[in-house]
Amino acid sequence: METFWRQWADPRERLKWVQKLVTENPRHPFTFLWRSESWAGVAARRNLIGLKLKRDEPLRIKLIKGILSEQYPKGGFRSSIGWTGLRLFQLAELGTPPDHPSIQRALEWLRKRQDYDGSLL
């Protein structure tokens, strides 16, 4: 993907290209992500094409707060290893710092469920 975007090193050129794409081809799969207010939409715009849009910042903060509000006091999400892993991935994609206390608590919760060989129980 990096090679593809190299042709538009300037983020403003990337933005123009994406805006043209979603305008001219409303059925293009990226159109959904471009307009999405989900974590996937924000993450795609931030990480996939490298656009940190001003319009996304309040939404990004709202999504992070929403995810963190679901965390149980002991650190897990829905008492599930898979769900906790997914939430950690989402938080990372949304740009939450790895040293955030809630992320550290979730990682510790996962470590406590790890077997001696590294597998999760």
Go through each PLM region and give its residues.
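Preference for long, amphipathic alpha-helical scaffolds in soluble/luminal domains
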Residues: 1-121
